[in-house]
């Protein structure tokens, strides 16, 4: 019986993870569930899964959970804050950790799981984007197992040589596919008028609002390029992005002999989650087998960097190295939140990120303190740019 901690249990990945878990009560139990503020939803999950720990982002949210559960809280340690998150991730009674907290907030608990030598199901790409070599060094030092949950990286992992799932060994190219999001064919000069609801309406995937906006700008793909660089040791010149509107081929690996291996499946996150939970075995995930006749044509196109400047910015940050990816991620988090609050236009997200990268000091990312200092500096610069250079939009 695998005992699981779910970091970010009330989000989209958390939902999908627990859906797979409830299909296999003989294989998995839940040790800990965490959420930022959704005490109501976490209470429902606590009643169903009876975790040993439940962690929320604030003391007020933890109190709300206690009130919600009442006498049903017996046997559940309810706590709050960053240290409690790290404890839930590293606890000796936990075997595996689903790292599904969105953004920079997920870095410390994910690293805590790595340092405890856990099986880490990595859905929090920002942990690798921000800390890169520090993260991978910790994986090697502490003997952790990291299984990528992003559909693209999960596909790459499945297509690489299984003895050593790394670049080399006859691998010549790694191709990450992208749907192109909801604005792939929209007139570029109309993108300034995009609303948050439009940006969050992904044509293929069900995702949270932040990652949906990242998909619409293709920053999500840019962050995934950086993640692939670190996870698989791929030189940047061997990383390629292709738009594949059907979201059926999740990524591809090209080999020196001309072979290209691809992983296909319906666009449902339960597939990579089930793969990560059961690896190296396979379990039922509730996802129907792909019907290629019904799917029909599979098409591909190169990304238009005029339409998707955030993708180019991510490649720039990867090539710059050091703390540049952390600054990129921080500025993007600030910009996306401002867009969702209707403080800036959709097209200003890239402007915020580009200005921040240009004005933020880039230094070697040789410690977590350095990484978080770069994160803080970039957030401050992004907010300054928004306050002084972005259009002041009328309230919705």
From Swiss-Prot:
This is 1-deoxy-D-xylulose 5-phosphate reductoisomerase. Pathway: Isoprenoid biosynthesis; isopentenyl diphosphate biosynthesis via DXP pathway; isopentenyl diphosphate from 1-deoxy-D-xylulose 5-phosphate: step 1/6. Belongs to the DXR family. The keyword Metal-binding applies. Mn(2+) binds at residues 150, 152, 224. Catalyzes the NADPH-dependent rearrangement and reduction of 1-deoxy-D-xylulose-5-phosphate (DXP) to 2-C-methyl-D-erythritol 4-phosphate (MEP). Its cofactor is Mg(2+); Mn(2+). Keywords: Isoprene biosynthesis, Manganese, Metal-binding, NADP, Oxidoreductase. InterPro entries: DXP_reductoisomerase (IPR003821), DXP_reductoisomerase_C (IPR013644), DXP_reductoisomerase_N (IPR013512), DXPR_C (IPR026877), DXPR_C_sf (IPR036169), NAD(P)-bd_dom_sf (IPR036291). GO terms for biological process: isopentenyl diphosphate biosynthetic process, methylerythritol 4-phosphate pathway involved in terpenoid biosynthetic process. Its EC number is 1.1.1.267. It comes from the Bacteria. The keyword NADP applies. Pfam families: DXP_redisom_C, DXP_reductoisom, DXPR_C. It catalyses: 2-C-methyl-D-erythritol 4-phosphate + NADP(+) = 1-deoxy-D-xylulose 5-phosphate + NADPH + H(+).
